[in-house]
Amino acid sequence: MEPAYLSREYFDRYEEMLRISERLGQKLIVYDDIDFPSGTAGGRLLREYPRYTRKLLEMQEFEVCGPARFEHPLAVSDTLRCMAVSAMETASRRIVDLGAAVRRDTLAWDVPDGVWKIMFFNCRYAVHPLVDYMEPEAVERCISMTYDEYAKRFGRYFGGVVNKVFFDDVGYVSMERTWTPAITGLFESRYGRPAALYYPALFYDIGPETAAARVAFYDLRAELM
């Protein structure tokens, strides 16, 4: 795009449009990005603040026959963060929160008798240029890079020549497992139960609580949006 989005030249052109619109008695609607959907700051958000962009829920799984000793490091990096660790016995679908078995970012668990699915529930960062709509700091940063830049330069036109702004399609845009780490803590605060006992329901049938667990997680996500 020329001139580059949000560059000095870009705003110079925008000011020309505003002056012409004012002289002709016309209105101008500000669109807050350069493409669909809104929330990328023209790609700058991903380049400059990747932790504030879209995140996905991922599950890493190991099947282990007990009794056995299982050890595995947790995901700890700028792009991947472990939110919960669980184990489900495949025959009974009994679920165990393995948080207490984590030491120094490593899971070390003595697996009981049976066949167990050991699951690490991770949040992967920076999977898409779009802002993480569910993280207030991320949204504030995106606003400061876009709306605030218009307001600093063209505030006198707002409420007059500029009487509308257009924000295009808040949503998940085909990434159904869009996530944010705050959901884990919010789940535990609201329901008083470890999220690790219910994350498996997002991937498996865990029994009678499956539907309720899914609704609980997705309700929280919808509220944050």
Protein language model regions, located:
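N-terminal-proximal low-complexity accessory segments that begin disordered
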Residues: 1-3
